[in-house]
Design a protein with these regions (language model features):
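GHKL/Bergerat-fold ATPase module in large chromosome/replication-associated machines
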Residues: 59, 77-99, 119-122, 129-226
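GHKL (Bergerat-fold) ATPase N-terminal catalytic module, capturing the glycine-rich phosphate-binding loop
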Residues: 1-125, 133, 140, 153
């Protein structure tokens, strides 16, 4: 499959938010099965139940609420996907009602793109600061890199030369946090660096840390700071 990743894009002119991956994708039949047949059974009730309270409770982004929570902020959602299987790509469109449209797509590369057509009362989801906040809050340690725009970095290519500024991908998350690595591979400075990543506004270093790496009678990994 190769290196997997996700990219998030904002198109303010079109008022759309794009989430793109290069995963295994879906066939048209899989879209019908997993997006329509399964999800529609509880989608209408879910949307009606949380329509008024979603902003106050911060319900967007909570685990397990599913794909259809996107209609809380979007008037229309599109899925353009191509499976790793040798089958045509599919383009699914829905406005949140039980009606949907699915047709073939010209997409050639494997993966899925979800396009949210952001509603008028949810324009803040077209702001970079808002999306950055959400990505950091809910996807900070996802196992695959998440790109959101670009950023400028300063490098010094050779000794004695002037610093040079380059544009690189802005990777929001840390796919390999400290707790996923064996303690033998980490130094004290690595733990302190990870602590600063977790708590950027905490200026004092922790007194000490405990790296949990248990595999019996259950699996448990983590880092405790004190």
């Amino acid at each position: 499959i190769g290196t997997l990743g996700v990219e998030v894009k904002i198109d303010k002119k079109a008022k759309t938010l794009h989430i793109i991956d290069n995963g295994v994708g879906m066939t048209a039949e899989e879209v019908k099965k997993y997006i329509n047949d399964v999800a529609f059974s509880g989608a209408e009730e879910f949307l009606e139940k949380y329509k008024e309270t979603s902003k106050d409770t911060g319900i967007i982004g909570h685990f397990g609420l599913g794909f259809y929570s996107s209609f809380m902020v979007a008037d229309k959602v599109e899925i353009i996907t191509k499976s790793y299987k040798d089958e045509p790509a599919a383009h699914w469109t829905c406005d949140g009602s039980p009606e949907y449209n699915i047709k073939k797509s010209e997409k050639n590369n494997r993966g899925t793109e979800i396009i949210l057509h952001i509603s008028k009362d949810s324009k803040d989801y077209l702001e970079e600061n808002k999306i950055t906040e959400l990505l950091n809050k809910y996807n900070k340690f996802m196992p695959h890199p998440i790109k959101f725009g670009t950023k400028e970095e300063t490098i010094q290519s050779k000794e004695g030369e002037k610093e040079e500024k380059i544009i690189v991908d802005n990777i929001i998350n840390n796919p390999n946090p400290a707790w996923t690595k064996p303690p033998s591979e980490l130094k004290d400075e690595d733990y302190k660096k990870f602590y600063r990543e977790l708590y950027p506004f905490q200026f004092d270093d922790p007194l000490f840390h405990i790296h949990l790496n248990v595999d019996y009678p259950f699996n448990l990994t983590g880092v405790l700071y004190f």
